[in-house]
Amino acid sequence: MNKTATCELLLFVSGEAGLTLTELSSLTEMSKQACQQQIDYLKEKYHSDRESALTIIETAGKYRMATKEDFSEILKNYAKTPLNQSLSKSALEVLSIIAYKQPLTRIEIDQLRGVNSSGVLSTLRAFDLVEKVGQVEAPGRPSLYATTEFFLDYIGINNLEELPEIDESRYVAEQQTLFNESEENENQ
């Protein structure tokens, strides 16, 4: 199998998280030096290819694929166009959680929802409704997410205080009812 293509594939599928040289080396069973050579080759290849919108960047010791800065406006315009369509229920749920409880980590969102929210968060970030606003000083340094100025414009409010109040006790009661019904169905 082609070493360059293997590194390129792994950088692509790692997405926003990226990979360290150690991780890439472990996944490819190549030395760190060999992985670095492949990354350097890919960086140069993308840099010199004026027909490609891709590049490889290094941030905090992790390598990831990204779009070249020249294409940022096109990407922003693309990301915003699907807003003419409706957001999925999952996206609306995550957006609501973030709007009312921000800032919070993906893990906190996952715990509130009971399912993984990575994909939905990526979608909301691509739509510029949610952004990373910092990191928690804890192992792994998880990112904190909050809504954007565009979110306020999109829903037509000036600040978060204008969000309608929610009755959390009603929400908790509804969740408990659903849980009890689910348990009853499993016991039958």
UniProtKB/Swiss-Prot annotation:
Entry's Gene Ontology BP terms: cell division; chromosome separation; DNA replication
UniProt superkingdom: Bacteria
Matches recorded under Pfam families: SMC_ScpB (PF04079)
Keywords carried by this UniProt record: Cell cycle, Cell division, Chromosome partition, Cytoplasm
Keyword field contains DNA damage: no
GO cellular component: cytoplasm
Cleaved signal peptide residues: none
Family statement: Belongs to the ScpB family.
Known function: Participates in chromosomal partition during cell division. May act via the formation of a condensin-like complex containing Smc and ScpA that pull DNA away from mid-cell into both cell halves.
PANTHER family for the chain: SEGREGATION AND CONDENSATION PROTEIN B
Assembly behavior: Homodimer. Homodimerization may be required to stabilize the binding of ScpA to the Smc head domains. Component of a cohesin-like complex composed of ScpA, ScpB and the Smc homodimer, in which ScpA and ScpB bind to the head domain of Smc. The presence of the three proteins is required for the association of the complex with DNA.
Protein name: Segregation and condensation protein B
